[in-house]
Amino acid sequence: MEKEKAQLMFKLAFSKRNWGAKYDRLEHFKRFQNLDKIVKELNKINWLIITKKQNYTGISLNTKFKKEIVEFIELYMPEVRGWIK
């Protein structure tokens, strides 16, 4: 499941650039089998920001933990080392 966490955070960080107040809909990440569990665990350690909008739930990465998040992604996905700035 750590690999899935890294993949979700990589998608938010690299592809969508969802850091801080830039949110993406939770429903856009349905392909992750353990999505609810992953989101709950990442939110518990404050790496993920969850906001309830009127029509959807938005998620974003916490900029306060950018260094730790990038290190985690590179640990479980070494092929993307250096891609996230």
PLM regions and their residue ranges:
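Short amphipathic alpha-helical interface segments
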Residues: 1-29
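Short, well-structured alpha-helical interface segments that form or flank functional binding sites
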Residues: 3-7, 34-37, 59
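Intrinsic-disorder-associated interaction segments
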Residues: 28-31, 62, 66
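Short amphipathic alpha-helical interaction segments
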Residues: 29-45
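A short, conserved structural fragment
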Residues: 43-53
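Minor-groove-contacting beta-hairpin "wing" of winged helix-turn-helix DNA-binding domains
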Residues: 55-62
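Short, amphipathic alpha-helical interaction segments positioned at domain boundaries
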Residues: 64-85
